[in-house]
Protein backbone atom coordinates (compact mmCIF):
# COMPACT_ATOMS: atom_id res chain seq x y z
CA UNK A 1 0.00 0.00 0.00
CA UNK A 2 1.44 3.29 -1.08
CA UNK A 3 1.46 6.35 1.11
CA UNK A 4 0.77 9.48 -0.93
CA UNK A 5 2.67 11.62 1.58
CA UNK A 6 5.89 9.68 0.94
CA UNK A 7 8.00 10.27 -2.16
CA UNK A 8 8.17 7.75 -4.98
CA UNK A 9 11.74 6.95 -3.91
CA UNK A 10 10.63 6.42 -0.30
CA UNK A 11 7.83 4.09 -1.37
CA UNK A 12 10.24 2.17 -3.60
CA UNK A 13 12.79 1.71 -0.81
CA UNK A 14 10.06 0.61 1.62
CA UNK A 15 8.73 -1.94 -0.88
CA UNK A 16 12.22 -3.29 -1.56
CA UNK A 17 13.03 -3.62 2.13
CA UNK A 18 9.72 -5.31 2.81
CA UNK A 19 10.47 -7.81 0.04
CA UNK A 20 13.93 -8.54 1.46
CA UNK A 21 12.56 -8.96 4.98
CA UNK A 22 9.79 -11.29 3.84
CA UNK A 23 11.95 -13.45 1.59
CA UNK A 24 15.55 -13.72 2.70
CA UNK A 25 15.62 -12.50 6.31
CA UNK A 26 12.31 -13.60 7.80
CA UNK A 27 13.31 -17.20 8.58
CA UNK A 28 16.85 -16.46 9.87
CA UNK A 29 15.48 -13.77 12.20
CA UNK A 30 12.60 -15.87 13.52
CA UNK A 31 14.73 -18.98 14.01
CA UNK A 32 17.53 -17.06 15.72
CA UNK A 33 20.04 -18.18 13.07
CA UNK A 34 21.46 -14.67 12.68
CA UNK A 35 22.01 -14.44 16.44
CA UNK A 36 23.41 -17.95 16.85
CA UNK A 37 25.77 -17.85 13.88
CA UNK A 38 27.05 -14.31 13.43
CA UNK A 39 29.26 -13.80 10.44
CA UNK A 40 32.41 -11.95 11.45
CA UNK A 41 35.98 -12.11 10.25
CA UNK A 42 38.48 -13.92 12.43
CA UNK A 43 39.88 -11.60 15.10
CA UNK A 44 43.60 -10.97 15.07
CA UNK A 45 45.24 -10.14 18.37
CA UNK A 46 47.23 -6.91 18.05
CA UNK A 47 50.99 -6.84 18.41
CA UNK A 48 52.16 -6.48 21.99
CA UNK A 49 49.38 -8.64 23.45
CA UNK A 50 48.96 -12.27 24.38
CA UNK A 51 45.56 -13.81 23.75
CA UNK A 52 44.28 -17.08 25.17
CA UNK A 53 40.94 -18.80 24.71
CA UNK A 54 39.98 -20.62 27.89
CA UNK A 55 37.37 -23.34 27.44
CA UNK A 56 35.22 -24.11 30.45
CA UNK A 57 32.60 -26.85 30.64
CA UNK A 58 29.83 -24.33 30.00
CA UNK A 59 31.24 -21.39 28.03
CA UNK A 60 34.46 -19.93 26.57
CA UNK A 61 36.46 -17.08 28.05
CA UNK A 62 39.07 -14.91 26.35
CA UNK A 63 42.07 -13.74 28.35
CA UNK A 64 44.03 -10.79 26.96
CA UNK A 65 47.20 -9.44 28.51
CA UNK A 66 50.01 -7.14 27.43
CA UNK A 67 53.25 -8.96 26.68
CA UNK A 68 55.86 -8.60 29.41
CA UNK A 69 53.63 -6.61 31.77
CA UNK A 70 51.84 -7.81 34.88
CA UNK A 71 50.12 -5.11 36.90
CA UNK A 72 48.18 -7.45 39.16
CA UNK A 73 44.96 -5.83 37.95
CA UNK A 74 42.35 -7.37 35.69
CA UNK A 75 39.10 -6.22 34.14
CA UNK A 76 36.29 -8.77 33.98
CA UNK A 77 34.41 -7.74 30.86
CA UNK A 78 30.78 -8.79 30.48
CA UNK A 79 30.05 -7.97 26.88
CA UNK A 80 26.87 -6.28 25.69
CA UNK A 81 24.17 -8.15 23.88
CA UNK A 82 21.39 -8.07 26.43
CA UNK A 83 22.11 -11.65 27.53
CA UNK A 84 20.73 -12.88 24.20
CA UNK A 85 23.64 -12.29 21.82
CA UNK A 86 27.14 -13.75 21.55
CA UNK A 87 30.41 -11.91 21.95
CA UNK A 88 31.57 -10.06 18.86
CA UNK A 89 34.83 -8.56 17.66
CA UNK A 90 33.89 -5.10 18.90
CA UNK A 91 34.18 -6.41 22.48
CA UNK A 92 37.62 -7.83 21.73
CA UNK A 93 38.61 -4.36 20.54
CA UNK A 94 37.13 -2.93 23.74
CA UNK A 95 39.30 -5.37 25.73
CA UNK A 96 42.44 -3.97 24.08
CA UNK A 97 41.26 -0.44 24.78
CA UNK A 98 40.46 -1.26 28.42
CA UNK A 99 43.94 -2.73 28.83
CA UNK A 100 45.53 0.44 27.47
CA UNK A 101 43.33 2.70 29.59
CA UNK A 102 44.24 0.73 32.72
CA UNK A 103 47.96 1.12 31.98
CA UNK A 104 48.53 -2.52 31.09
CA UNK A 105 45.83 -4.34 33.00
CA UNK A 106 44.70 -7.77 31.84
CA UNK A 107 41.18 -8.32 30.52
CA UNK A 108 39.04 -11.44 30.80
CA UNK A 109 36.00 -11.42 28.54
CA UNK A 110 33.45 -14.17 28.95
CA UNK A 111 31.18 -15.40 26.19
CA UNK A 112 28.45 -16.25 28.66
CA UNK A 113 25.52 -18.52 27.90
CA UNK A 114 22.56 -16.63 26.45
CA UNK A 115 18.78 -16.85 26.39
CA UNK A 116 16.52 -18.36 25.28
CA UNK A 117 18.59 -21.57 25.25
CA UNK A 118 20.02 -20.76 28.68
CA UNK A 119 17.57 -18.61 30.68
CA UNK A 120 18.35 -16.65 33.82
CA UNK A 121 20.43 -17.23 35.91
CA UNK A 122 22.87 -18.92 33.45
CA UNK A 123 24.69 -15.71 32.44
CA UNK A 124 24.97 -14.62 36.08
CA UNK A 125 26.38 -18.03 37.05
CA UNK A 126 28.94 -17.69 34.24
CA UNK A 127 30.01 -14.27 35.51
CA UNK A 128 30.45 -15.61 39.05
CA UNK A 129 32.43 -18.58 37.71
CA UNK A 130 34.75 -16.23 35.79
CA UNK A 131 35.28 -14.06 38.87
CA UNK A 132 36.21 -17.11 40.96
CA UNK A 133 38.45 -18.40 38.15
CA UNK A 134 40.43 -15.16 38.22
CA UNK A 135 40.99 -15.55 41.97
CA UNK A 136 41.65 -19.29 42.08
CA UNK A 137 43.43 -19.97 38.78
CA UNK A 138 45.14 -16.66 38.02
CA UNK A 139 45.60 -15.65 41.67
CA UNK A 140 44.28 -12.09 41.38
CA UNK A 141 43.38 -10.34 44.60
CA UNK A 142 39.60 -9.72 44.72
CA UNK A 143 40.13 -5.98 45.18
CA UNK A 144 42.21 -5.89 41.96
CA UNK A 145 39.36 -7.21 39.81
CA UNK A 146 37.31 -4.54 38.11
Enumerate the language-model features and the residues they cover.
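Serine-hydrolase catalytic-loop signature spanning alpha/beta hydrolases and amidase-signature enzymes
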Residues: 82-90, 107, 133
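Alpha/beta-hydrolase fold nucleophile elbow
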Residues: 138-146
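A glycine/proline-hinged amphipathic helix-loop "lid/cap" segment
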Residues: 1-66
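Proline/glycine-enriched tight loop/beta-turn segments at coil->beta junctions
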Residues: 66-74, 103
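Short amphipathic alpha-helix adjacent to the substrate-entry channel of hydrolases
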Residues: 89-109
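Alpha/beta-hydrolase active-site loop
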Residues: 118-138
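Short beta-to-alpha linker loops that shape the active-site pocket of alpha/beta-hydrolase fold enzymes
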Residues: 110-115
